[in-house]
């Protein structure tokens, strides 16, 4: 995504999210608000939420940024909020921290048939992972019926966010844990 219009053009990392995303993540904006349900409707989502880092570096942390129109990919969008500095998603992903968030519904048809969307949700208290898996399997089945040419046999896999985030590095973490344990054992036996 390219920010133009005020100052030098900037290439930014943007993430498209559904309106309830920030509520699900349990975070409120530091300035302004998050997306409304109306803005999460195709054709009505010409709004953006900025990261704290972008707000400070490009807009000098001015509270007047809310309501301002900026240009993203040469299209006018209105800034509605700024997230707090502590908010990053995915957590611990410092190398790819988003600069801004846009409503996904504004461009939802573009994602039909693509299989790279990452869906995050919060399981209600008392609901097991198996129940959540069963519910979402029903949703996936309904989507496969609605889009028969695009389902490609893909399904839904419910996993805790933490487990998903450490999946790629888990073997290395376990090896490191074992090595530290061995060093501790050697250190204790030499006392």
Regions found by a protein language model. Name each.
Residues 1-2, 84:
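Generic short beta-strand segments
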Residues 41-42, 64, 175-176:
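Short, flexible hinge/linker loops that cap or flank conserved catalytic cores
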Residues 3-7, 33-34:
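A short gly/proline-enriched turn/hairpin at secondary-structure junctions
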Residues 169-191:
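Hydrophobic alpha-helical transmembrane segments of multi-pass inner-membrane transport and secretion
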């Amino acid at each position: 995504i390219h920010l133009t219009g005020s100052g030098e053009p900037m290439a930014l990392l943007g993430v498209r999210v559904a309106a309830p995303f920030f509520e699900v993540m349990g975070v409120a904006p530091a300035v302004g608000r998050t997306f409304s349900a109306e803005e999460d409707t195709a054709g009505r989502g010409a709004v953006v939420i900025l990261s704290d880092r972008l707000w400070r570096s490009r807009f000098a942390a001015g509270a007047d940024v809310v309501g301002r129109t900026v240009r993203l990919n040469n299209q006018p969008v209105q800034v509605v909020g700024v997230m707090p500095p502590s908010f990053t998603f995915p957590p611990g992903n410092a190398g790819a921290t988003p600069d801004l968030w846009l409503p996904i519904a504004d461009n939802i048809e573009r994602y039909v048939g693509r299989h790279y969307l990452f869906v995050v949700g919060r399981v209600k208290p008392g609901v097991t992972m198996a129940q959540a898996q069963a519910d979402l399997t029903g949703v996936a089945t309904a989507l496969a019926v609605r889009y028969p040419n695009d389902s490609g046999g893909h399904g839904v896999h419910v996993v805790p966010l933490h487990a998903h985030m450490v999946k790629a590095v888990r073997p290395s973490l376990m090896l490191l844990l074992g090595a530290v344990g061995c060093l501790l054992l050697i250190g204790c036996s030499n006392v």
